[in-house]
């Protein structure tokens, strides 16, 4: 299944060529009005008849590799186009032999091991040149012993890694009340969705026979017979503590003394069945779906069982199948894409009652979630009313999507305005109730910040909790500012209370870095976080935050890719930040190439700062706009191969295929609005 018209994006792997980044009409760029019109036309051409927009959500090859492994475990590989998946995996291999976490990262060990395993399961012999190169890469990086926990779990399921090297998750964890310190509800929903099925899997420790039978002994740098069968130490006292606890759990397992074992397993099974959507999804994201199906297989569910069949159908919905390749996405993003496209089209001048926008608005209204989900365990007084990221995910609405949808709906004129306003009011109440104690907002839960959980042996990705973040907190505050700016006719009680806004502003001020930037959790990285914070502060409290706004704007100007500001890297007037800035803060705002989406974010931040300060960085903004104009393609789109979406910093990134479209259109539209109002002067040619 292909989201939107893929023909434009199939470009013989220009995707992996950094030199094509930003390739467009450099010699004859369109005018500002022409670029905006072309972009509008392009986006309108991508709308589905039902009213939504939906583009590919590209990740790394891990998701596709896991799908190969799963279907081999289930023995139904003939139900998936495995030959096309092999072609995809082969194409994604880099010249050094590894597979990458994001384009240009030099290869990543765990991604490479999982891709190698998938190809071997697809009957590719170890003597194949591609696998010989991959094996050398793996051994040079330390082999299986240095890979992440999820990689080791996959190998353990195939009998190729010792279960003693996998942490224990005693089933009685399922019986802990929601308020308990180590309850499953103290973990982030994405972690929770993996922990619950893995409680069953870790208890049963299954080994599945697959065809062809493989050992993968060659992946152990030290030889499998010498491989360490205990959990690795991380060097701090918490690591020592949890490993000691794990040894106790394992000793109890060997002695057959596991309290409430069967009860806990039944509760885990019940929990999963309750949360499976009618469409088959578990939480709407790939890892919980993968482990939930493995859990069902472990519990004895047949492949023909309706629970399993529905789940397998959802895997196919996550697939991108082309003429000769097939890959799998980590999730689907129609609500997110639709809301952001709607905002960009209205901002750029499309009438709020345009038929395409009305269809989108009606579709969004249908997707509001009015039933309580997992979020209510820590927010029992909240009124349900948020939106989720996906087509269906009723248990897990999120704050980011909800705030963006509210802003999108607010700028539309729909046939039934009362229904629209009622939906917005309900969502505002929910968002207000989700504010965390520290003043910020998180993605899915309230006060989900027990950071000690990240020290458990299971959490080598350090993503077990869902704390407040700058970008989501800023989005909520931007929403409040936009509603008031548009003169939306809600009672003051329907907005966030003044004390909540004040606490949110204190949180944003506290999170600002010394350089003036803000960290970005869900977009790469400091450019994203800084843009969000500047937009929010300029809308909600510009007079009392002039210093913070000025510092943020100065930082954006300093990291722009312009001659005289940078010795190395591009000097094209755009902005670009590498995913490596999560590994090394010294790379804040730095990158090898400029990108359309990150340039758009920077422009939004600078324009907002100019509104607040009464003075715009005209030269910097002008160069950024010129970069976008000169890189637009003839059909009105922008090409971007870089990963600018956040998943799990350092461990998983995303490339939203519409980010280079709607964010860019919004930025150009905001620039034009200020030109027309004579707030900003055009740059001197």
From Swiss-Prot:
Q: What class of enzyme is it?
A: isomerase
- Answer yes or no on keyword Repeat: yes
PFTB repeats sit at 82-123, 265-308, 424-465, 621-672
EC number annotated for this UniProt entry: 5.4.99.37
Q: Which CDD domains match?
A: SQCY_1 (cd02892)
Q: What does this protein do?
A: Squalene cyclase producing the tetracyclic triterpene dammaradiene.
Q: Which UniProt keywords apply?
A: Isomerase, Repeat
Per its UniProt record, what NCBIfam families does this chain match? hopene_cyclase, squalene_cyclas
Instruction: From the record, give the transmembrane residue ranges.
Output: none
This chain's source organism reads: Dryopteris crassirhizoma
Q: Where is the active site?
A: 400
Question: Which reactions is this enzyme annotated as catalysing?
Answer: squalene = dammara-20,24-diene
Q: Per UniProt, what is one Pfam family of this protein?
A: SQHop_cyclase_N
Q: Which GO terms describe its cellular component?
A: lipid droplet
Q: Repeat: is it a keyword of this entry?
A: yes
Listed name of the protein: Dammaradiene synthase
| Any single biological process term in GO | triterpenoid biosynthetic process
The family this protein is said to belong to = Belongs to the terpene cyclase/mutase family.
Task: List, in alphabetical order, the Gene Ontology terms for molecular function in this entry.
Answer: intramolecular transferase activity
Give the superkingdom in one word: Eukaryota
The organism's taxonomy opens as: Eukaryota, Viridiplantae, Streptophyta, Embryophyta, Tracheophyta
């Amino acid at each position: 299944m292909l989201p939107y018209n893929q023909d434009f994006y199939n470009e013989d792997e220009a995707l992996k060529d950094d030199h094509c980044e930003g390739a467009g009409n450099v010699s004859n760029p369109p005018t500002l009005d022409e670029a905006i019109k072309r972009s509008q036309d392009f986006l309108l051409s991508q709308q589905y008849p039902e009213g939504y927009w939906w583009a590919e959500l590209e990740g790394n090859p891990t998701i596709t590799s896991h799908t190969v492994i799963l279907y081999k475990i289930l023995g139904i590989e003939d139900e998936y186009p495995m030959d096309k998946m092999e072609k995809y995996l082969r194409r994604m291999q880099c010249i050094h032999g590894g597979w990458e976490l994001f384009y240009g990262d030099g290869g990543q060990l765990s991604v490479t091991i999982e891709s190698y395993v998938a190809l071997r399961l697809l009957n590719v012999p170890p003597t194949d040149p591609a696998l010989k190169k991959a094996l050398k890469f793996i051994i040079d990086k330390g082999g299986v012993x240095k890979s992440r926990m999820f990689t080791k779990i996959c190998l353990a399921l195939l009998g190729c890694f010792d279960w003693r090297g996998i942490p224990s998750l005693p089933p009685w964890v399922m019986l802990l009340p929601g308020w308990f310190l180590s309850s499953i509800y103290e973990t982030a929903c994405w972690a929770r969705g993996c922990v619950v099925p893995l409680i069953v899997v870790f208890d049963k420790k299954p080994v599945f026979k697959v065809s062809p039978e493989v050992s993968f002994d060659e992946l152990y740098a030290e030889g499998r017979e010498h491989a360490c069968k205990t959990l690795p130490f991380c060097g701090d006292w918490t690591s020592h503590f949890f490993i000691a606890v794990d040894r106790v759990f394992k000793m109890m397992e060997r002695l057959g003394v596991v309290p409430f074992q069967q009860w806990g397993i039944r509760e885990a099974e019940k929990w999963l069945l309750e949360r499976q959507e009618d469409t088959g999804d578990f939480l709407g994201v790939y890892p919980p779906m993968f482990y939930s199906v493995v859990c069902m297989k472990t519990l004895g569910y047949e492949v023909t069982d309706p629970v399993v069949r529905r789940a397998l159908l959802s895997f196919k919905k996550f697939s991108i199948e082309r003429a000769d390749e097939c890959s799998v996405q980590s999730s689907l993003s129609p609500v997110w894409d639709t809301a952001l496209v709607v905002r960009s089209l209205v901002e750029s001048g499309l009438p709020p009652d345009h038929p395409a926008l009305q269809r989108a608005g009606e579709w969004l209204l249908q997707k509001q979630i009015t039933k309580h989900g997992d979020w209510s365990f820590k927010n029992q007084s909240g009124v349900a009313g948020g939106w989720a990221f996906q087509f269906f995910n009723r248990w897990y609405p999120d704050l980011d999507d909800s705030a963006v949808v509210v802003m999108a709906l607010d700028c539309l004129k729909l046939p039934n305005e009362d229904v629209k306003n009622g939906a917005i009011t309900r969502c505002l109440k929910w968002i207000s109730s989700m504010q965390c104690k520290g003043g910020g907002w998180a993605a899915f839960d309230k006060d989900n910040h027990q950071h000690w959980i990240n020290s458990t042996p299971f959490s080598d990705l350090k993503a077990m909790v869902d704390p407040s973040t700058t970008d989501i907190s800023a989005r909520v505050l931007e929403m409040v500012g936009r509603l008031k700016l548009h003169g939306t006719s809600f009672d003051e009680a329907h907005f966030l209370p003044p004390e909540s806004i004040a606490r949110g502003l204190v949180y944003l001020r506290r999170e600002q870095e010394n350089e003036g930037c803000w960290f970005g959790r869900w977009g790469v990285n400091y450019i994203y976080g800084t843009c969000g914070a500047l937009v929010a502060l300029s809308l909600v409290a510009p007079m009392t935050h002039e210093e913070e706004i000025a510092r943020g704007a100065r930082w954006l100007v300093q990291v722009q890719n312009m001659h005289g500001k940078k010795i190395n890297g591009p000097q094209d007037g755009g902005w670009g930040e590498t995913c490596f800035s999560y590994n090394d803060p010294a790379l804040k705002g730095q990158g090898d190439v400029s990108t359309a989406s990150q340039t758009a974010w920077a422009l939004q931040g600078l324009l907002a700062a100019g509104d607040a300060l009464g003075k715009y960085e005209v030269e910097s903004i002008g160069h950024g706009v010129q970069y976008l104009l000169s890189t637009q393609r003839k059909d009105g789109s922008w090409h971007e191969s870089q990963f600018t979406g956040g998943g799990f910093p350092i461990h998983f990134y995303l490339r939203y295929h519409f980010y280079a479209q709607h964010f860019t259109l919004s930025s150009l539209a905001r620039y034009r609005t200020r030109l027309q109002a004579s707030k900003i002067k055009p740059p001197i040619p």
